Amino acid sequence: IVVERDPIRTSFEKWAKPGHFSRTLAKGPNTTTWIWNLHADAHDFGSHTNDLEEISRKVFSAHFGQLAIIFIWLSGMYFHGARFSNYEAWLSDPTHIKPSAQVVWPIVGQEILNGDVGGGSRGIQITSGLFQLWRASGITSELQLYCTAIGALIFAALMLFAGWFHYHKAAPKLAWFQDVESMLNHHLAGLLGIGSLSWAGHQVHVSLPINQLLDAGVDPKEIPLPHEFILNRDLLAQLYPSFAEGLTPLFTLNWSEYSEFLTFRGGLNPVTGGLWLTDTAHHHLAIAILFLIAGHMYRTNWGIGHSLKEILEAHKGPFTGEGHKGLYEILTTSWHAQLALNLAMLGSLTIVVAHHMYSMPPYPYLAIDYGTQLSLFTHHMWIGGFLIVGAAAHAAIFMVRDYDPTTQYNNLLDRVLRHRDAIVSHLNWACIFLGFHSFGLYIHNDTMSALGRPQDMFSDTAIQLQPIFAQWVQNTHALAPGSTAPDATASTSVTWGGGDLVAVGGKVALLPIPLGTADFLVHHIHAFTIHVTVLILLKGVLFARSSRLIPDKANLGFRFPCDGPGRGGTCQVSAWDHVFLGLFWMYNAISVVIFHFSWKMQSDVWGSISDQGMVTHITGGNFAQSSITINGWLRDFLWAQASQVIQSYGSSLSAYGLLFLGAHFVWAFSLMFLFSGRGYWQELIESIVWAHNKLEVAPVIQPRALSIVQGRAVGVAHY
């Protein structure tokens, strides 16, 4: 086995020496810059040592620490559900009672924040979606949440132990970290395969029967406990008769026997407004089988299966030179390159999740909890954006620290770098085109609107710009199941169209979402902001090592303020600065997406439904006519939605008014860092230090202004 025993003695001595990982920092502080450098470099293992094995072990060990923190955090969430929540009340009436897991104590009048959440309880309404997740998992009591919270703490302790053990007692050798095929097999078959299989098993044996009874209106306290379903097959057979046959249908290939609890329905459950849980159980079982197969595809101890190095080196087309040759070496020796790819893919996937959470709501009653829908969409969009910017950051660090041009001749990476001017200038042209045209459509509409010429505007009632391709995609997906899945009762998502609206408890869960001129316009703003973000980030990566302006950029490192004295106009060109600028455009892009989603859903989807079947949308369907002008966005969205919060003082909503104000203060504070020069502050500090010297109270550690890069980092964080 490839481990080294007792490589590093366990001791707390280093904890008492801040900066022990760096010769300069270990000397202690001379100026206040020291504390900033300490924070910047503490986790930059690559700057502590060049030994790849040691770096890998530190990262591996840190991952266990990260998992421990996640377990503690989740434990806290579940504990709040067990101790401070109205979960059991919500479970008995999810359409009228709002989820709450936090009660504010009566200190200085804060208890005004506790609103009436229904069911006789007062508290703060939560929008995390955890109640809906717990119901889907089959949790029926606060005691079960309590047990889960304790279990998570035990797992956290286990993770902390593993982190210590695999660094101090049995540390893997470098060869273990570089054994790609074995890692793929274990991650695919173990994490994704057995992980999905165990979840499918839990769903079939615990979640489905409990949810079936809950949907039928059985009191949660009457429902058998999870272990009873697991241990007593007759209980399950009462709900799903085929359970009485055990595994016989599986081995006799008579799988259709199981179609009671492994379904292929499509659409939403009309009782809960969520996906059919029998569909999701089926899905997880299918996914598990795919990944279990995938986990046996790579060549390890037996001479069969794929070798990744061989696949990559064979991968070349007629116009791509050496193709993927050399990439295997990059990905097994540069963890930054590996991380960049993983962040890009995971970030994109997270954004895909954001869009599926509302169009295919996976948990019961999630779709009618509009605040939660909005929160989950916002959360997943932001996380996805951060991960994608992180991908560019680590790709640039790879270029600066790990890229070796001598081993990369005429392969795809080299060829991309050689024609980077063409890539960047074409991308720049695309950004200019998208920016002028998308914004120009709005400006045209504002002008026509101001001049009183509505017949000359781009709108659904005047000059139409219908998103015909999007409508075609919607239509195809609405009709497809008819021929591809004849037994399915509905298409994958209600949003495609063709079906009816789904209403739960007098509220719209989901309906076919109409797309028109307004969506066409804002879609092109999305295209514009995303392309600009990509332009900035990609330029940062492609020019991380050198440029016409600074040919020796690689020697200056990942982050530097300027190319030294006597070279004016070379500031803010480091790879770090590109990440910094890219972040702003990422914020920009995602703000527009969240605005679009928020208004579109309130205008065209969310609302109440009368006994006669009349739908009243929250903002009365005003998106199509109002969002086609900039003025409409400002007046009918930003102001209309913010005014309630701004006027919330003295009500149970006042926390949001204070947060709204506070967030804008923090944002304004960021501008102080972003719009000021370092010299200004250094000058000011020197005057203040002079005064301290006069009074003989000057500190030993000299105060210094933040460096340019530090100031911008503080600024972008507050922004």
UniProtKB/Swiss-Prot annotation:
GO terms for cellular component: chloroplast thylakoid membrane; photosystem I. This is Photosystem I P700 chlorophyll a apoprotein A1. It comes from the Eukaryota. The keyword Hydrolase does not apply. [4Fe-4S] cluster binds at residues 562, 571. The keyword GTP-binding does not apply. It holds the Pfam family PsaA_PsaB. InterPro entries: PSI_PsaA (IPR006243), PSI_PsaA/B (IPR001280), PSI_PsaA/B_CS (IPR020586), PSI_PsaA/B_sf (IPR036408). Chlorophyll a' binds at residue 664. Keywords: 4Fe-4S, Chlorophyll, Chloroplast, Chromophore, Electron transport, Iron, Iron-sulfur, Magnesium, Membrane, Metal-binding, Oxidoreductase, Photosynthesis, Photosystem I, Plastid, Thylakoid, Transmembrane, Transmembrane helix, Transport. It is an enzyme of class 1 (oxidoreductase). P700 is a chlorophyll a/chlorophyll a' dimer, A0 is one or more chlorophyll a, A1 is one or both phylloquinones and FX is a shared 4Fe-4S iron-sulfur center. Its EC number is 1.97.1.12. One of its GO terms (molecular function) is oxidoreductase activity. It catalyses: reduced [plastocyanin] + hnu + oxidized [2Fe-2S]-[ferredoxin] = oxidized [plastocyanin] + reduced [2Fe-2S]-[ferredoxin]. It is a multi-pass membrane protein. Belongs to the PsaA/PsaB family. Chlorophyll a binds at residues 672, 680. PsaA and PsaB bind P700, the primary electron donor of photosystem I (PSI), as well as the electron acceptors A0, A1 and FX. PSI is a plastocyanin-ferredoxin oxidoreductase, converting photonic excitation into a charge separation, which transfers an electron from the donor P700 chlorophyll pair to the spectroscopically characterized acceptors A0, A1, FX, FA and FB in turn. Oxidized P700 is reduced on the lumenal side of the thylakoid membrane by plastocyanin. The chain crosses the membrane at residues 59-82, 145-168, 184-208, 280-298, 335-358, 374-400, 422-444, 520-538, 578-599, 653-675, 713-719. The PsaA/B heterodimer binds the P700 chlorophyll special pair and subsequent electron acceptors. PSI consists of a core antenna complex that captures photons, and an electron transfer chain that converts photonic excitation into a charge separation. The eukaryotic PSI reaction center is composed of at least 11 subunits. Phylloquinone binds at residue 681. One of its GO terms (biological process) is photosynthesis. It is found in: Plastid, Chloroplast thylakoid membrane.
